[in-house]
């Protein structure tokens, strides 16, 4: 497997400085959300082609790949103006990502944490937004990767499969698989069976995996953990990777730079 990180876990840096830092830390690649990670860029509206060229050159020089350009948008929001902004921003980022040499543009399908009823109500809005973004992805031949999250419109395996079938374009619609964002009931879920079900159903669509770990504190509060010290069970995911996609990118999220070495070692053992 190739090992990467969500780069803004290291804070904001200059373009050249970040590329050098990631190489020194031992990563093969990174997920870049440009306004969150570069000192030169504070919003998506700030991005210029000169930035994109600098990023491409700096990361090529340091031999750090960009498997994901992060552009996480509120695609399912019932507010039309919010959705319009999400769609137009993603379309623009598809162009930037292609120029930058990124593998995919990654997004979730909402911002807020939704109730079960809200997830269902937001689904039609999500699909409308997604179909419009996919028109641009197809036009410029660039991949969009959507990330299922159990508290968003793209919440469950059934919804994910329905979305894949409706778009019907595996060349341009891909998935980011984040196991921790799919584990709604960790206390009662047979993780081995659950991951096998997901991977058997949509594994061919997965381009990247996000890797993180956590525990549940008081009132089930989410508490990030070092890899291997929380409730995630990666054995079946690891087996599937070796059998099916041994060259896939594993991107560490919620990285604590102080424990980067241990987390990188964990991912290399997967």
Indicate where each model-derived feature is located:
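Active-site acidic/histidine proton-transfer and metal-coordination neighborhood
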Residues: 16-17, 53-54, 58-65, 75-177
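Catalytic domains of carbohydrate-active enzymes, especially glycoside hydrolases
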Residues: 18-35, 101
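Glycine-rich, proline-tolerant flexible connector loops at the mouths of alpha/beta enzymes
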Residues: 33-55
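Active-site-proximal loop/turn and secondary-structure-junction residues that shape catalytic pockets
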Residues: 9-11, 34-36, 73-75, 109-113, ...
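Conserved, mostly hydrophobic/aromatic
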Residues: 22, 30, 59, 86, ...
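Short, acidic/polar
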Residues: 12-22, 85-94, 191-199
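Acidic/histidine-rich catalytic cores of soluble enzymes
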Residues: 30, 121, 131-231
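Hydrophobic faces of well-ordered beta-strands that scaffold small-molecule active sites
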Residues: 3-7, 30-32, 66-71, 105-107, ...
């Amino acid at each position: 497997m190739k090992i990467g990180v969500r780069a803004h876990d290291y804070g904001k840096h200059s373009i050249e400085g970040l590329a050098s830092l990631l190489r020194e830390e031992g990563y093969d690649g990174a997920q870049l959300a440009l306004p969150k990670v570069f000192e030169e860029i504070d919003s998506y509206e700030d991005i210029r082609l000169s930035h994109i060229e600098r990023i491409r050159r700096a990361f090529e020089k340091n031999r750090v790949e960009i498997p994901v350009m992060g552009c996480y948008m509120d695609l399912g929001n019932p507010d039309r103006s919010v959705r319009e902004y999400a769609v137009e921003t993603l379309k623009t980022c598809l162009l930037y990502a292609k120029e930058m040499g990124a593998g995919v543009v990654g997004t979730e399908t909402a911002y807020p944490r939704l109730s079960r009823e809200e997830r269902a109500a937001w689904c039609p809005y999500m699909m409308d937004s997604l179909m419009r973004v996919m028109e641009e992805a197809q036009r410029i031949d660039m991949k969009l990767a959507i990330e299922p999250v159990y508290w968003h419109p793209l919440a469950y395996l059934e919804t994910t499969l329905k979305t894949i079938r409706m778009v019907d374009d595996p060349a341009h619609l891909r998935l980011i698989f984040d196991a921790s964002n799919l584990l709604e009931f960790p206390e009662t879920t047979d993780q081995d069976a659950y991951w096998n079900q997901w991977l058997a159903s949509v594994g061919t669509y997965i381009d990247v995996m996000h890797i993180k770990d956590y525990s549940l504190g008081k009132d089930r509060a989410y508490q990030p953990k070092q890899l291997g010290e929380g409730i995630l069970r990666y054995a079946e995911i690891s087996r599937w990777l070796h059998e099916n996609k041994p060259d896939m990118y594993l991107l560490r999220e919620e990285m604590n730079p102080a424990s980067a070495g241990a987390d990188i070692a964990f991912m290399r053992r997967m």
